[in-house]
Amino acid sequence: MAITDWPEGERPREKLRAAGAMALSDAELLAIFLRTGVAGKSAVDLARELLKRFSSLNGIFAASAEEICQVHGMGLSKFVQLQAIFEMSRRALLEQMQGRDVLTSPQAVRQYLSLRIGALPREVFIGIFLDAQHRVLAVEELFSGTLTQTSVYPREVVKCALRHNAAAMIFAHNHPSGVPEPSQADRALTEALKAALNLIDIRVLDHFVVAGNQLVSFSERGLI
C-alpha cells in the first residue's frame, strides 16, 4: 500500500508535523528522505529493508554506492541523497565542536567520531588538531588501512600538526571488528605519537577507539 493511502496520522510527513521528528522511527525518518518506494513497496518498506540489511543508520551511510544499489528500489539518485544527509549531519556535529573547548563538550566529539568513522568497513586513523584553547582547527583523515592493520607514521603526523599550527591533538581510529577495546599495537602507537609530538611541544589529549556507537577513551582509561 502506498503511503498516500495510509491514515493521515500514520504518514511520516504528517506525523512529523503533528508530533515532531522525535516521534518518528528510524525507518519513518529515512522514508521522508527517500520520498518514493517502488511497486509493491512503500518508502517506509524500503527504509526498513535498508536498516535490516545494513544494521543501522550508520551502516547505511557507510555503505558504498554499489552496495546501496543492490537493494531493489534504490539507485544512484537515492544514494546521493543519503550521502548528502550524512555529510550535513557530520558538518553540523563539527560545527558544535568548533569555537569551543572540546574538553568541555566531550559528547559532541564522541557523536562526531561515531558518525564519521564508526561504521566504516576499513580501518581509518584521524586527527583532530586543536589550538591552545583546545578549539578545533581542523579534522583530517591521516591514514587508512585494511580491516586489521593501519600504518601510521609519526613523522607525517608531526608535519600535519605543524602545518595547522596545532597546540594539542586528539586521535581516533575505528575497529571494523565491532570491538572498541584498545590493542597493544594501539597503545604502542599512541606512545610513539606522544613522544614525537612532545618534541615540538604539542600535547596529545586523547585517543579514541571507535566501533559503531561504542567508543573507548585512552584518557578515561588512564592510558595517556
Swiss-Prot record:
Q: Which CDD domains match?
A: MPN_DUF2466
| Short name of one Pfam family | UPF0758_N
What keywords were assigned to this record? Hydrolase, Metal-binding, Metalloprotease, Protease, Zinc
GO MF terms held by the record: metal ion binding; metallopeptidase activity
Q: Where does Zn(2+) bind?
A: H173, H175, D186
Annotated protein name in UniProt: UPF0758 protein Mfla_0315
| NCBIfam families linked to this entry | PRK00024.1, radc
- Which GO terms of type biological process are on file? proteolysis
Origin species, per record, is Methylobacillus flagellatus (strain ATCC 51484 / DSM 6875 / VKM B-1610 / KT)
Indicate which residues form the motif JAMM motif: 173-186
Q: How far does the signal peptide extend, from start to end residue? A: none
Please give the family membership noted in the entry.
Answer: Belongs to the UPF0758 family.
